[in-house]
UniProtKB/Swiss-Prot annotation:
InterPro entries: PSI_Ycf4_assembly. GO terms for biological process: photosynthesis. It is a multi-pass membrane protein. Seems to be required for the assembly of the photosystem I complex. It comes from Nandina domestica (Heavenly bamboo). The chain crosses the membrane at residues 22-42, 57-77. This is Photosystem I assembly protein Ycf4. Belongs to the Ycf4 family.
Length: 184
């Protein structure tokens, strides 16, 4: 959801609470739980999962390896669930032409730097930059070039914008901020 008026432009950024992250976290959790159960059932010599007979899987080396993969998968799955729970990467971009201030806010991981808040003056913005890399894995990223700060990404790398969409977004933002567009 975005909100724009003549003087203020607010763009909400979706973080890690995306459908694909939920999907992969569920798949990884269920798969690693299955591996751990098969490894445990081969150790105990009993069937914990009725789909696989545990007598066919020896504990050494297959059961140990499956248990290791199950534990590793549970750790990775818990990491994914934590990023979803904390909504890492979400936030907003606020461009206020009336005050001449740009505010960029993102949620990070818990700790001292959980809230990432950048604030700078509009007159420090040099340009809006589009970086395009074509090929097998095309990448189109929109940056804001800031004097003394470098380039600040405004779109996510995994956001698959078409060339038309990224040009449209860059043109609208450059027009709103009254800065030039650079293409790399």
């Amino acid at each position: 959801m975005n909100w724009r008026s003549e003087r203020i432009w607010i763009e909400l950024i979706t973080g890690s609470r995306k459908t694909s992250n939920f999907f992969w976290a569920c798949i990884l959790f269920l798969g690693s739980l299955g591996f751990l159960l098969v490894g445990t059932s081969s150790y105990l010599g009993r069937n914990l999962i009725s789909l696989f007979p545990s007598q066919q899987i020896l504990f050494f080396p297959q059961g140990i390896v499956m248990s290791f993969y199950g534990i590793a998968g549970l750790f990775i799955s818990s990491y994914l669930w934590c990023t979803i729970w904390w909504n890492v990467g979400s936030g907003y971009d606020q461009f206020d032409r009336k005050e001449g201030i740009v505010c960029i806010f993102r949620w990070g991981f818990p700790g001292r730097n959980r809230r990432i808040f950048l604030r700078f003056l509009m007159r420090d913005i040099q340009s809006i930059r589009i970086e395009v890399k074509e090929g097998l894995y095309p990448r189109r990223v929109l940056y804001m070039e800031i004097r003394g700060q470098g380039a600040l990404p405004l779109t996510r790398i995994d956001e698959n914008l078409t060339p038309r969409e990224i040009e449209q977004k860059a043109a609208e933002l450059a027009y709103f901020l009254r800065v030039p567009i650079e293409v790399f």
